[in-house]
């Protein structure tokens, strides 16, 4: 949970990555970091970026990017719980400021079960959540209410837990692999209709949530392949804004 060693130190938030095996959690995190490492988030003379001083994490990311560049394939599913520690920093007219630090837990999909005591403890000890659902799966199951309900089961369990414990922790729901949808065949409309039952459920419980659409395709380059990102880090920035009770880009010289 959020903590700080002194009043003036930036808070440290714990975020939990939730989703079934192969849904695209690790690719999302890599895509988010690519954007914020390359300073793509700029507005009104302000600039945001992630900073990571852990050499092991840097080596992990570099290894994944090399694999993508050489093979044109996504990384294999995560086999063990991985912690990623980052600092979110801002540069503006007043100089550089550390907004906050966060640790993102990225457990393997098979351990993301609400009846798993270790996973349950991670849920209760987290400050915010990124829940991942395969957009193509929603479209494929749109005409099968029972199968569609199973797709949302984990997210609904988390929402139930938040509601029963009277918690307003933010929940970012990331619909992955949207670049694979066939919009010429109305997959977009089918997707919107498919997520309606989940939205109705979350709103009934008054969960603090937002839905995001993620597209991180692999594209060919002169040097091989790379991940193509566009606003991939928006869900994490939204979580940071909610946890800090401020718009990330509405900050002036006085940073909370």
Feature roles, as predicted:
Residues 141-165:
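Amphipathic helical hotspot of TIR/SEFIR-family domains
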Residues 109-110, 136-138, 178-181, 217-220:
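Conserved nucleotide-binding/hydrolysis micro-motifs of P-loop NTPases
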Residues 180-248:
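Canonical P-loop GTPase G-domain recognition
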Residues 129-130, 159-179, 197-213:
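Conserved beta-strand/loop subsegment of P-loop NTPase cores
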Residues 2-78, 91-102:
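Conserved G1/Walker A P-loop phosphate-binding module
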Residues 97-117:
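Switch II (G3) loop of P-loop NTPases
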Residues 114-144:
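Inter-motif core of Ras-like GTPase G domains
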